[in-house]
Amino acid sequence: MTNSDFKIALLVLYIFIFLFGTLNVILMSCMLQSQRHLSFTKVSVINLIAVHSIFLLTLPFRIYYYASNKDWILGMYFCKIVSLMIHAHMYLAFIFYAFLLIVRYVEHSSQRHKLEFHRILHATIASTTVWLIIFGSMFPVTIYYGKMQNDSTQCFHFGKALEQPSVKIFNYGTCTLVILVWSVLAFFQVYFLLYVSKTFGKATCQRQEFWAQLKNVVFLSVMFFCFVPYQGFRVYYVSEYGKTAEIHHINEVFLAVTAFSCFDMIVFAGRDVCKLINSRGWFNCL
């Protein structure tokens, strides 16, 4: 595939993500209106809405860059911000997915009560801590990231930093950690599914516990299809960087796929979304 072919592919992907991602954020916001208690799940969903919304604000700049086929005219630092936001979106979303699944696993283990935040302050502190850790670690990266990129008219070409051994090690470690965390979560999910199946036998499909576990499987599937392929290919990309020009474009496509996590609630709560639209009407949510 030529360079223009990859640009067209990225353009189509980002337009699709922007349109349906925006729809997803609107529907998620509407669904939260019906939840009164400040549960751990609701806090995670609120954070996911914020993560998706901030990322979606940067997508028009990517779309314009790939659609116009012209030079980047907004400066290198803004290019860095737009470039880093897709990475921040990926890792923040992954953290909140993992947090949400862990809470649901704990709730399943101790079925006596549902975990809730009893004070808004506690939820705010917990959420702010995660945001500060991610963006605090990315602030110095924003300053030093892309110093080897001398052409300010081209954006999203910062791969030369991978020539540094420390950057390679950091990438290997991050990719391994993400895949490892997902694998551990998947292991516990299989355990809980087997436990529910063994406990209820033939009546498993009629039990609420089983369908609750299937919802967890949906989140795990979103994490797997959106994040794991990129992390797996990233290991290969880092080790083979610079050998072919095509590998950079393939990496960008895998990176774009991570943004499909913006559709999480449409997939997770499809039936509830349909009920919401039918009962309240589309414009009541706007």
Language model features: what each stretch is:
Residues Y191-G232:
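Intracellular effector-coupling site of seven-transmembrane GPCRs
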Residues M1-I26, L38:
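Extracellular N-terminal segment of 7TM GPCRs
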Residues M1-L11, W72-M85, Q154-N171, R207-F210, ...:
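Juxtamembrane membrane-interface segments at transmembrane-helix boundaries in membrane proteins
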Residues M90-I125:
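Class A GPCR helix-loop hinge within the 7TM core
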Residues F6-L11, T41-V43, N47, V51-L100:
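Extracellular TM2-ECL1-early TM3 structural module of rhodopsin-like
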Residues R119, G136-L180:
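Loop architecture of class A 7-transmembrane GPCRs
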Residues F225, G232, H249-L286:
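Seventh transmembrane helix
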Residues Y14-I17, L27, M31, I54-K70, ...:
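Helix-to-loop junction signature of class
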